[in-house]
């Protein structure tokens, strides 16, 4: 019974640390995206390739 409790406790702590690290990384990414110019650049990077693919599909190229 003791080894099972010990391994479950270890698993719990490792999962907690992992979630904490993920949350810190997500917060850092959100801070980087706070500037509107960077947000607009990201939208443009995602938008133009999609439009290009749609237009090339419609034009038959």
Swiss-Prot record:
Its main location: secreted. Keywords: Amidation, Amphibian defense peptide, Antibiotic, Antimicrobial, Cleavage on pair of basic residues, Fungicide, Immunity, Innate immunity, Secreted, Signal. It comes from the Eukaryota. One of its GO terms (biological process) is defense response to bacterium. InterPro entries: Frog_antimicrobial_propeptide (IPR004275). Residues 23-46 form a propeptide. The keyword Manganese does not apply. It is found in: Secreted. The keyword Signal applies. Residues 1-22 form the signal peptide. One of its GO terms (cellular component) is extracellular region. Expressed by the skin glands. The modification Leucine amide is found at residue 59. It holds the Pfam family FSAP_sig_propep. Antimicrobial peptide with activity against Gram-positive and Gram-negative bacteria and against fungi. Has been tested against S.aureus (MIC=7.5 ug/mL), B.pumilus (MIC=7.5 ug/mL), B.cereus (MIC=75.0 ug/mL), E.coli (MIC=7.5 ug/mL), B.dysenteriae (MIC=20.0 ug/mL), A.cacoaceticus (MIC=60.0 ug/mL), P.aeruginosa (MIC=5.0 ug/mL) and C.albicans (MIC=5.0 ug/mL). Also shows a weak hemolytic activity. Belongs to the frog skin active peptide (FSAP) family. Temporin subfamily. This is Temporin-ALi. It comes from Amolops loloensis.
């Amino acid at each position: 019974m003791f080894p099972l409790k010990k391994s479950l406790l270890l698993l719990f702590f490792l999962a907690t640390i992992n979630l904490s690290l993920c949350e810190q990384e997500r917060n850092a990414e959100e801070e980087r995206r706070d500037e509107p110019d960077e947000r607009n650049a990201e939208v443009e990077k995602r938008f133009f390739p999609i439009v290009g693919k749609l237009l090339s599909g419609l034009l038959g190229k």
